[in-house]
UniProtKB/Swiss-Prot annotation:
It catalyses: a 2-demethylmenaquinol + S-adenosyl-L-methionine = a menaquinol + S-adenosyl-L-homocysteine + H(+); a 2-methoxy-6-(all-trans-polyprenyl)benzene-1,4-diol + S-adenosyl-L-methionine = a 5-methoxy-2-methyl-3-(all-trans-polyprenyl)benzene-1,4-diol + S-adenosyl-L-homocysteine + H(+). S-adenosyl-L-methionine binds at residues 74, 95, 123-124. The gene is ubiE. It holds the Pfam family Ubie_methyltran. Belongs to the class I-like SAM-binding methyltransferase superfamily. MenG/UbiE family. Methyltransferase required for the conversion of demethylmenaquinol (DMKH2) to menaquinol (MKH2) and the conversion of 2-polyprenyl-6-methoxy-1,4-benzoquinol (DDMQH2) to 2-polyprenyl-3-methyl-6-methoxy-1,4-benzoquinol (DMQH2). CDD domains: AdoMet_MTases. Keywords: Menaquinone biosynthesis, Methyltransferase, S-adenosyl-L-methionine, Transferase, Ubiquinone biosynthesis. This is Ubiquinone/menaquinone biosynthesis C-methyltransferase UbiE. The keyword Glycoprotein does not apply. One of its GO terms (biological process) is aerobic respiration. It comes from Edwardsiella ictaluri (strain 93-146). One of its GO terms (molecular function) is 2-methoxy-6-polyprenyl-1,4-benzoquinol methyltransferase activity.
Amino acid sequence: MVDQTPETTHFGYKTVAAADKAGKVAQVFHSVAGKYDLMNDLMSFGIHRLWKRFTIDCSGVRQGQRVLDLAGGTGDLAARFSRMVGEQGEVILADINDSMLKIGREKLRNMGIVGNLNYVQANAEALPFPENYFDCITIAFGLRNVTDKDKALRSMFRVLKPGGRLLVLEFSRPQFVALSKAYDAYSFHILPRIGEMVAHDGDSYRYLAESIRMHPDQETLKGMMAAAGFENTTYDNLTGGIVALHRGYKF
């Protein structure tokens, strides 16, 4: 782990000023936004769709509810939630990055998903919504990019209704030694090459690999959610722990 102080944080394996991280992450996603969906399919061999489907199946979202898809990017989860909540419900796709938000908006409008879906540029650490507003919040592959994760979790807790749930889908720690070694080799040697060939940006995908290693492991994130106020916090390891889905409730 990289040593940190309250004034510094990690950006991949680098130590940077905490105030600078959001801008550096923004540069990464401005760079890859146009190829984001294609790269997700290529680098996960399409398995990210199964991870997201499992998240949706675990959400418990029903007709008429209000859902926040945080760090929603190009809108894979928001599109499904829009259909699930129906005309009387509401889905907000929020992302701090305007390039990702623009592509998500265009993609979903081209799919004919309008009416109950709104778009908000927002920082997860200071969500611009009232207290007790959402029935469900999801954040998929976004929490590791947040500078102050504890602050972001508290912000999510604040805007979640009593009885509501948070689902955090994120890269995590493989549970088997052989899988971990193979995953490291793929992440650090093959993934940046794919990024260079397809998105013309190997550095951003090298950051991706590093940011995954710096993200809290399954048990640590579970404890962070509990510290933010969430109860009955559990997680499921997916694909041997390469990804984990954490769930917590506000009572």
